[in-house]
Each structure stands twice: as C-alpha cells, then as structure tokens.
Amino acid sequence: MSVVLLDEAIVHYEVLGKGRPVIFLHSWIGSWQYWISAMQVASTSFRAYALDLWGFGDTTHKTTHYTIDQQVALLRSFLKEMGIGKVALVGHGLGALVALDYTSKYSDEVDRIMAINCPVKSGMLHEKMRKISTIAGLVEWISGSAPNVQAALGDATKADLSAIATTVNGGRAGEIFTKANRQHTPCLLVNGRNDPAVSVPDIHQISDFSHLSHQIVLEKSGHFPMIDDAAKFNRLLTDFLALDSGLSPSELQLKDEWRRRVR
C-alpha cells in the first residue's frame, strides 16, 4: 500500500506502469480497488494512478475536507507531490465531478477527461442517493446485487457516510459541468444505460456540449461499467487514451465498435 502525507493527513494511492500519467478517481461507493482491471490495461502504455479521496478507502477521514472543492484540492496537492504535469483524468460519479471541477480551474494541466456516469445537470442524481442511511444498503441498491460488483466493492464500507452525503447534497453538478465545458478540454462522457443512480443525459441536455465533448452509452452496463462489461469498457478506455492530444473523442466513432453507440 502506498501513501503520501497531504495536509498533515494520510492519502492512499496505488500506481502501475510507466509513461504519461493517468489518474483514476472513484465514485461515491467504493475506492481505488474497483479500478484494478482498468489500471492494468492502461499501465501497458501509461503510468496509472488511483487514489482514495478524503473519507474513502484507506485515506484519512477528515470531515472538514469532504466538499468537492476540498477533494479537488486533494487532487491538486497529490499531483504536485508526485511531480505530475499534464494528465489524463478518468473519473467516475463523484470522481468525475472532481475531475471536471479540477479541469474548470486548471485546464492547462488536463490533457483529456473521461467522465463516467456523471450528473451533468442538476436533478440527474437519483433521490435515493440523498437519503442514504447505511453504506451496505447503498451498495446493494447501486450494484443490483450483482456478485462481481459487490466483490469489487468489498471495501466500500470503509467510507465515512458523511463523505458521501456531503458531495451528494452539494447540488453543484450542473455548475461544475458547465464551467468545465467552457474550457474546451477533450471530454468523453460514458454512461451505463442501466445506472440506477445517475440518469443518462438526453439529446437536449447534451446539446450545448463543447465540440471537444462526446458521449457514448454502454447499453448493458449499470453504475459500474468497468465491472459490468469490463472487456468493452477497457477497449473504450484504451482507444480514448490512444487519441492524439487535442482531438475530439468523436473521432472514436470512426471505429465500428463505437459508431452505433454514439449519442
């Protein structure tokens, strides 16, 4: 287990591979652990990092640091501590909001973003996320009781419930995406069609996307496409990371596999 001391507190992370940096940021449920397969795939060409945000996994429970602004500050401190320059960000749920907010503030440091099951407008997050009483109950609901998903979320109960509630109830999703969208950083939005927590944006909600933003819907996935359909997700991740810097993710539709899934 690798740790770094930031703001006088322990932050846990894992790293694989060599090359240009990619940072994986987890959702409201779970930790770095469910990224293992994606990290292994990315690490063949990139240096893949995954960290636990404040209040999750083996990172310190620091109740004053649970807002999205504080999670963004954690990411910035981590990148500086690791000596990482321009980076690709792969964020999921909460992690996607952190990645987008980071981009809105430090766009010159972000090469591209993959935002997975991210609420891009207010009201896209299911009301159940705002009424959580136990993490175990939330895991059961969001995983659909799928054994492989539940196994990958084995350390989800390490999280501080307040860390989830603070960001769920922050109500900044629409604002965060709008600000990031103005930066014209290449951004691929990936949605699982069957995600119970975050609704899939419709054509009206994505009509104001930057020309460097693009959406792909994975029809057989829920909230965890990197687990529900790992092979397909990892191919998409590989193709996305392989795009030349500055290219729109819409270039992915040149490949037959993604053409019919484009929104």
Predicted regions and their residues:
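Conserved HGGG/HGGXW glycine-rich cap/lid loop of the alpha/beta-hydrolase fold
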Residues: 9-60
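Catalytic active-site module of serine/aspartate enzymes centered on a nucleophile-bearing elbow/loop
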Residues: 217-263
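Active-site loop/oxyanion-hole signature of alpha/beta-hydrolase fold enzymes
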Residues: 49-90, 235
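Flexible "cap/lid" loop of the alpha/beta hydrolase fold
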Residues: 97-105, 110-141
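Conserved alpha/beta-hydrolase "acid-adjacent" motif
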Residues: 196-202
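Short beta-strand/loop motif that positions the catalytic acidic residue
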Residues: 183, 189-191
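Conserved alpha/beta-hydrolase "nucleophile elbow" surrounding the catalytic nucleophile
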Residues: 26-28, 87, 91-93
